[in-house]
Amino acid sequence: MFPVKVKVEKSELEMAKARNQLDAVLQCLLEKSHMDRERLDEEAGKTPSDTHNKDCSIAATGKRPSARFPHQRRKKRREMDDGLAEGGPQRSNTYVIKLFDRSVDLAQFSENTPLYPICRAWMRNSPSVRERECSPSSPLPPLPEDEEGSEVTNSKSRDVYKLPPPTPPGPPGDACRSRIPSPLQPEMQGTPDDEPSEPEPSPSTLIYRNMQRWKRIRQRWKEASHRNQLRYSESMKILREMYERQ
């Protein structure tokens, strides 16, 4: 009995590895967020007496004392305490994570928030700045269009709001699929009845014939794909000009 080899798909291993790496990154971000929150709580829990002791210790070391009068220092401490009291509930409602050297506050988004505003806030890299909420009932402003309805041109730049449609794949009324080529007809090699039939071909001969046929089929698919891409040449030209202007 021959031994049976179990082949493990490489894609499953890569998927499991990527999933483990993602879990590790999320766990690290969660732990770091807890540490940052504890540090903020410790800073918010400091009393004015701690600040006064710090001022006394600085004066004892011989450094220049603060030029403020006692009533000014008391006023400043009172303002700091009021700011901490007002900012306490706001800080407790923040959930800042850092991913690839950029931070975003996820507490400002709900479960139904689309991914685009979250990515936009992450790219801004300013967790303290909250994303402006757009009312779902407010209609979007209409896009300015010219006579053709494809683009708007001003004196400085060319703003494109709509790409031109692709050219038709074939003549009007012809329902053909431009991406799928026509099937290649099999080669029938028949022999007259009076001639003796050829012996059965060997496996290597069959493989060679099939390889030659599949090469022609693959070439037909490449040509069909190239013809289909040419239908979008105008759109590609506009996108290329937009990319080169950046």
UniProtKB/Swiss-Prot annotation:
Keyword Phosphoprotein (UniProt): yes
Spans annotated as Disordered: 37-90, 129-209
InterPro entries from the UniProt entry: LIN37
Residues bearing PTM Phosphothreonine: T167
Protein name, entry field: Protein lin-37 homolog
UniProt modified residues of type Phosphoserine: S135, S138, S182, S202
Domain of life: Eukaryota
Covalent link Glycyl lysine isopeptide (Lys-Gly) (interchain with G-Cter in SUMO2), residues: K5, K7
